[in-house]
Amino acid sequence: MEGIKYNLIGISGHKNSGKDLVANMIQYLTSSYYPKMEFLQYLKENKQSVTDSSFCIKRFADKLKDIVCILLGCTREQLEDRDFKEKELPEEWWCWKVYLDTKYYYHDYELAPFTGELDVYKQLHESPENFFGHELVKLTPRLLLQLLGTDCGRNIIHPNIWCNVTFADYKPRHFRTVKYNGIFSHQEMILPNWIIPDVRFPNEVKAIKKRGGIVIRVNRSGFEDNDIHPSEVALDNYQYFDYIINNDSDIPALLEKVKEFLYDGQDIKSNSK
């Protein structure tokens, strides 16, 4: 498709809002299968896995998911399955979340915190009376992704950890010689075309825009999401999306909105913040 001005398109939205679907639509609309093949047929035949589109899909969570697959002994295909992702892990993965002061700690499930084992935590604090309680956490693959990605990765190792490991692979495909009036001018760097459909935090938006990309928001009406983990709500009040797509109808209607964005929408709004 001609007229695409950006090499890098980020997509934000709650889970099940349609982020991946929009990413697949962008791939479809920039592939040789459009318009000769219908979009649903394109998905059914798994054509998005063929490197035919000018855009490829990358995720900030790709390498995080690889780590979780190693920990759980599962495949990426399993981890991408919605039912598998929400299924409780075996009991050996359960733990107690113990609240002390303004912090919380994870405690072995087999050592119930309301027994003498809790004294271990109390003895480590000058104010043991600040124990605020506990709750049983039955880990799921999704929760494990959140804990490793945000609570551990972003909050302990580095806030930009997943941006850094993702863009370490964002390297020029080649260089193009640019001439002016037939005379050599300079070498132009040609970067790969990426769609990143799991933008969750302001620093991820910043990382994309820093590299000349744009970020769109996908909203889905009538779909209640009670997940309040920071990875799901950190961008709820963000005001600098470059484009907003409301997924409030069926797939053909959504495809038309994505088509409008690709053809015309990139001139509607541009925020650099």
Residues covered by each model-derived region:
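Extreme N-terminus of proteins, especially the signal/transit-peptide cleavage junction
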Residues: 1-6, 51-52
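Hydrophobic anchor at the beta1->P-loop junction of P-loop NTPases
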Residues: 9-11, 196
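Small-molecule kinase domains that catalyze NTP-dependent phosphoryl transfer to phosphate-bearing small molecules
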Residues: 3, 12-17, 24, 94, ...
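A conserved segment at the C-terminal end of the G1
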Residues: 21-33, 40
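Switch II (G3) loop of P-loop NTPases
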Residues: 194-201
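Short coil/turn segments at beta-strand junctions that form active-site/ligand-binding loops
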Residues: 5-7, 190-193, 213
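ATP-dependent small-molecule kinase phosphotransfer cores
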Residues: 41-191
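Residue-level signature of catalytic and energy-coupling elements of molecular machines
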Residues: 145, 196, 245
